[in-house]
Design a protein with these regions (language model features):
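Conserved SAM-binding strand-loop segment of SAM-dependent methyltransferases
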Residues: 138-146
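Conserved SAM-binding loop
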Residues: 132
Length: 263
């Protein structure tokens, strides 16, 4: 409405437009555009189905060995892990895993933030990784299936200091719980492999509340009971670690962080 009104005014000559330059009309149009963008990105919050989360976690913990045994490691993931292992062993530095790194922007940012650490970004999508993003000498980008990668990490002698899981696919429909990491059969592998700290960010607070509940239940069942949850809390100044985080910040969509820390 505001944009079309501005177009109509432009046909009446510059004098009628002059009072609005940089003023209320432009500000209102910008505000409306921001509201539209926020409505596109925002996912409605809802109450966590505690019983459903607990039931799934109990099943996955009880059947985890069966899940691992019936699933062969993907060949490309085995090769990628070999590369990761050699890279990590060549450096005497704390190891950080950027799980689901997408185009590698977050891996680059983390490598710059932690120059004395080794940062390995892992994503399943060759298309995203093929963007050709350059990373510093302390970083590496690899294509691999995360479930298999975590399994190989757990079977290796590598020690992970911290894992970042930034803006994973939320699969927002209620029936999609099994597709979210907290409801997936690979959850025990993730918790075992994440190291001393797991940092998760999302624009959907419900996702993080659900993950916190799942991790707590897994801890009760003996899967990383040493991990203590902090959050989720809203980030006051998100730094744009990923393209999603940058989009959300521009659209005025709040983003949240959950930290699981070894204590």
């Amino acid at each position: 409405m505001l944009i079309s009104m501005a177009r109509r005014c432009s046909t009446l000559g510059p004098r009628l437009l002059r009072p609005y330059r940089g003023g209320a009309l432009r500000a209102a149009a910008l505000h409306a555009a921001t509201d539209d963008a926020a409505s596109i990105y925002a996912i409605p919050e809802r109450d966590v189905d505690e019983a459903a989360v607990h039931q799934l976690v109990e099943r996955h913990v009880a059947q985890h060995a069966t899940y691992l045994n019936k699933r062969p490691i993907a060949k490309h993931t085995a090769a990628a892990f070999q590369t990761a292992s050699e890279f990590a062993r060549s450096r005497t530095a704390p190891l950080i895993i950027d799980a689901g790194c997408g185009t590698g922007r977050s891996t680059l940012k983390l490598a710059e933030r932690y120059p004395d650490s080794t940062v390995i970004g892992v994503d399943r999508s060759e298309a995203r990784l093929s963007k050709g993003r350059r990373v510093p000498a302390n970083a590496l980008l690899l294509r691999a299936e995360l479930g298999d990668f975590w399994r190989l990490l757990n079977d290796s002698e590598l020690t992970v200091e911290e894992t970042f899981l930034l803006y994973p696919n939320p699969y927002p429909k209620t029936k999609m719980l099994k597709q979210r990491f907290q409801g997936h059969a690979s959850l025990p592998s993730l918790l075992h492999a994440c190291g001393r700290r797991l940092t998760i960010r999302a624009s959907w607070r419900t996702y993080l509340e659900e993950f916190r509940l799942a991790a707590s239940k897994a801890g009760e069942l003996g899967i990383r009971p040493d991990l203590v949850s902090k959050g989720p809390y809203e980030l006051s100044e998100p730094e744009g670690l990923t393209l999603f985080e940058r989009k959300y910040a521009k659209a005025g969509v709040p983003v949240y962080e959950l930290v699981l820390k070894c204590e």
